[in-house]
């Protein structure tokens, strides 16, 4: 799957109301990368992340619409890469409550989730301990 297809599928699954076009979504991703965010591709998923403190990153998952099992596997591989790079914790904000259940299935990592009131994209926060 191409990056454009990953973005298109994520857009359909997570923003079905048409609030963003594919071009706007891709431009937002490009801007984020130009402003210091980093990207890891794992299969048909992208993990976009930035440092928020020493050894801690904030990450956002862009999923190409794969099955939950494949998605967990892709996310696990990306998190293992961050662990190898020296990160101790990854914080993942999101809106869909179901995502907490997916994250809780990550093998070997300690995962805690809390409800926030931080606006769009920040209803929940899951912290994944990598070390």
Regions found by a protein language model. Give the residues of each.
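Short acidic/polar active-site loop segments enriched in Thr and Asp
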Residues: 88
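Conserved acetyl-CoA binding element of GNAT-fold acetyltransferases
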Residues: 52-66
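Short amphipathic alpha-helix that is part of the acyltransferase structural core
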Residues: 1-27, 130
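Conserved beta-strand-loop-alpha-helix junction that forms the acyl-donor binding cleft
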Residues: 91-104, 115-119
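Glycine-rich phosphate/pyrophosphate-binding loop shared by adenosine-nucleotide-utilizing enzymes
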Residues: 42-47, 57, 123
């Amino acid at each position: 799957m191409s990056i454009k297809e990953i973005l298109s599928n994520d857009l359909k699954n997570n923003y079905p109301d048409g609030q963003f076009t594919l071009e706007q979504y891709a431009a937002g991703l490009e801007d984020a990368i130009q402003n210091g965010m980093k990207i890891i591709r794992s299969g048909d998923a992208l993990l976009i992340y930035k440092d928020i403190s020493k050894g801690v990153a904030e990450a956002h998952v862009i999923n190409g619409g794969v099955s939950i099992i494949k998605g967990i596997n892709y996310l696990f591989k990306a998190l293992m890469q961050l662990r190898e790079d020296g990160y101790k914790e990854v914080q993942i904000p999101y809106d869909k409550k179901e995502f907490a259940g997916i994250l809780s299935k990550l093998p070997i990592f300690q995962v805690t989730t809390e409800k926030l009131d931080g606006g769009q994209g920040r209803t929940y926060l899951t912290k994944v301990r990598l070390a």
